[in-house]
A protein has these predicted regions:
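Boundary/linker segments of alpha-helical solenoid repeat arrays
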Residues: 52-56, 87-97, 149-157, 193-230
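Bacterial Sec signal peptide processing site at the extreme N-terminus
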Residues: 15-37, 48
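"A position-specific structural signal for the A-helix of alpha-solenoid helical repeats
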Residues: 26, 62, 66-69, 116-119, ...
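Residue signature of alpha-solenoid helical repeat architecture, marking inter-repeat boundaries
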Residues: 18, 52-54, 114-115, 156-163
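Inward-facing hydrophobic residues that define packing positions of alpha-helical scaffold repeats
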Residues: 43-45, 80, 87, 141, ...
Length: 371
């Protein structure tokens, strides 16, 4: 099947950023919010210092996004490549996470959240599609699922709700579909549908789009999978009727709507209670949180003396502040027909839920790591 990919963006922003950085780059943020991307590009070029400081990942993510919006797809991918390499260079383990959470936000480097890392590959895939490079676009969407597996390995005892990306699987299906590989397209669509109906519906309140169901039926038919076709016809309560495809192909329309959330922070104050015999407890009365900590054997005398002099500990954690979407729905009108757009990915929901999972999983380690 011949597809034409159309990507329409209204104030779409992949980087959540942090509140202090957001305030310092007000002119850039204002230019982006007004759709003045040439001005935003000039502001980035003028402030090359950001490319070398602790927020250099943010700089290259912003550059990749702005170049994408300007239609400079190769330049966009060059910036995203640098951002991707920088994220891979950062250590990914619980000790580092704890240190990041409790250190001074003005000193620590910006560390992208998991969904932001995934969005790098998403935008690289879109760039390759715009360059009509289906093969490399497919590589990027495959990397999304591999990267999700790697990211989830960081939290073996507190698995994320964001373990599979349904939209990445859907995009993979579209690319296979465009290449005429209907069997692999069906497999990708099926994976996407299963992820929507399990992970996404349960965790993010998002069910499979109707168009995905239609594509699943069509590719099952085109692949000669009669049993699968019959099963999905029964499940969807709709009969598939083969129809000739338009000679000039079909339009795939993506609408990327809204800004990602802004990252701020919140803190919890713990009071130390010495239980004796090397056992202390960190307690927060307001939230009802209590974490026991043994500091006997294995700790030096200096460590024990330092801990003995501490009565109160404040641990700082990240949080998100949502920026509402400018539009709540969209409709395409063509040839006398209206097509209502359906949401396929809710970045806000993913951001809030996964951050909650991460903080819940490492809060105890962060309290202990403070010492």
């Amino acid at each position: 099947m011949k597809f034409r990919f159309c990507i329409v963006l209204f104030l779409c922003w992949i980087v959540s950023s942090c509140a202090t950085w957001y305030q310092r780059t007000a002119a850039f943020q204002d230019a982006v919010s007004k759709g003045e991307f040439e001005q935003a590009e000039k502001l980035l070029q003028k402030d090359k210092k950001q490319a070398r400081d602790k927020n250099k990942i943010l700089y290259y993510l912003n550059q990749g996004y702005v170049e994408f919006m300007l239609g400079h797809y190769e330049k966009s991918n060059q910036a995203f490549e640098i951002a991707e390499q920088l994220t891979e260079d950062q250590q990914r383990n619980l000790l580092t996470e704890a240190a990041v959470l409790i250190s001074n936000p003005e000193i620590r480097p910006y560390r992208p959240e998991d969904f932001e890392v995934i969005m790098i590959n998403f935008y690289k895939a879109l760039n390759y599609l715009q360059l009509n490079n289906m093969e490399d676009a497919l590589v990027e969407v495959r990397k999304i699922n591999i990267r999700l597996q790697q990211l989830n390995d960081k939290y073996p005892d507190h698995k994320n709700r964001y373990q599979r990306d349904a939209f990445a699987q859907l995009l993979m299906g579209l690319i296979y579909d465009a290449a005429g590989d209907y069997n692999n397209a069906f497999i990708a669509y099926r994976n996407a549908y299963n992820t929507y109906q399990t992970d996404y519906l349960k965790n993010f309140g998002l069910a499979a789009p109707e168009q995905l169901k239609k594509d699943l039926l069509r590719t099952a038919y085109q692949s000669g999978l009669t049993q699968e076709l019959a099963g999905y016809e029964k499940e969807f309560q709709q009969k598939y009727t083969p129809a000739p495809l338009p000679a000039n192909g079909q339009l795939v329309f993506f609408w990327l709507n809204g800004f990602g959330p802004v990252k701020a922070e919140w803190g919890i104050t713990f009071t130390k209670i010495d239980k004796g015999d090397g056992v202390i407890v960190f307690h927060n009365e307001e939230l009802g949180l209590t974490f026991p900590f043994f500091w006997g054997n294995g700790y030096s005398e200096n460590d024990r003396n330092s801990l003995a002099n501490i009565d109160v500990v404040r641990v700082v954690f990240p949080k998100y502040v949502e920026r509402p979407r400018p539009f709540t729905q969209g409709v395409i009108s063509y040839d006398g027909k209206n097509y209502t757009l359906q949401m396929a990915e809710d970045i806000n929901q993913i951001a809030f839920k996964t951050l909650h999972d991460h903080v819940e999983g490492i809060i105890q380690f962060a309290v202990a790591g403070r010492h």
